[in-house]
Curated annotation (Swiss-Prot):
Domain comment in the entry: Lacks the C-terminal regulatory region which is replaced by HisZ.
Species for this entry: Nitratiruptor sp. (strain SB155-2)
Pathway, per record: Amino-acid biosynthesis; L-histidine biosynthesis; L-histidine from 5-phospho-alpha-D-ribose 1-diphosphate: step 1/9
Key words of the record: Amino-acid biosynthesis, ATP-binding, Cytoplasm, Glycosyltransferase, Histidine biosynthesis, Nucleotide-binding, Transferase
Protein name: ATP phosphoribosyltransferase
Taxonomic lineage of the native organism: Bacteria, Pseudomonadati, Campylobacterota, Epsilonproteobacteria, Nautiliales
Gene symbol of the encoding locus: hisG
């Protein structure tokens, strides 16, 4: 049996829909249930940011999670397949009336994604102070906490509603199938077969 960590929310729902299409079986978590055993799989419903942790520690053989989370977590796990759904961008956001300007000596940047943010500005040789927040990131520039934010953008509507605008895309993200390295070698045939089935449904190959 393969154990698969799925994030709560849209990516998790899209993942189960993909499994239903592949195996012609209903995969549905019971009310308030965090574990689902069906069709020869054990699915675990966890927080988005925790999926790589469950996979890294082999509490799950496989996981499905956004590339942004993988880039931020930086754990030693295998990326097997870009699933193509759950697409979003990681963008710098600024006040709607401002222009993006990197001429100041340094900047304050509010974000949940410290590593992605630090890497981007480091490569540009732009000095920044990163302010780690856990929610309501859009508020930071409006109250003078930060000059700009780095956040996930799907349509940009949340930023616009809060007087901000996406000014620069840092990276694109979509859902990836990931594997624990030990699990991959112990269950290689099973995992590769599943990857092939998923790829066939998604991409026809």
């Amino acid at each position: 049996m393969l154990t698969i960590a799925l994030p709560k929310g849209r990516i998790g729902e899209d993942s189960l829909a993909l499994f239903e299409k592949i195996f012609d079986t209903k995969f549905e978590f019971g009310k308030r249930k965090l574990i689902l055993e069906a069709g020869g799989f054990r699915f675990m419903k966890v927080r988005n940011q925790d999926v790589p942790t469950y996979v890294y520690h082999q509490a799950a053989d496989l996981g499905i999670v956004g590339l942004d989370v993988l880039e931020e977590k930086r754990l030693d796990i295998m990326r097997l397949l870009d699933l193509g759904f759950g697409r979003c961008d990681i963008c710098i956001g600024i006040k709607a009336e401002e222009s993006l300007d990197f001429s100041k000596p340094s900047y304050k940047v509010a974000t949940k994604m410290e590593n992605i943010t630090r890497d981007f500005f480091s490569k540009k040789a732009i000095p920044v102070e990163i302010i780690k927040l856990y929610g309501s990131i859009e508020l930071a520039p409006l109250v003078g906490l930060a000059d700009m934010i780095v956040d996930i953008v799907e349509t940009g509507e949340t930023m616009r509603q809060n007087g901000l605008k996406p000014a620069l895309k840092i990276m694109e993200s979509s859902a990836f199938l990931i594997a624990n390295k030990n699990s991959f070698y112990q269950k290689k045939a099973q995992i590769l077969h599943l990857r092939e089935q998923m790829s066939k449904v998604l991409y026809g190959s």
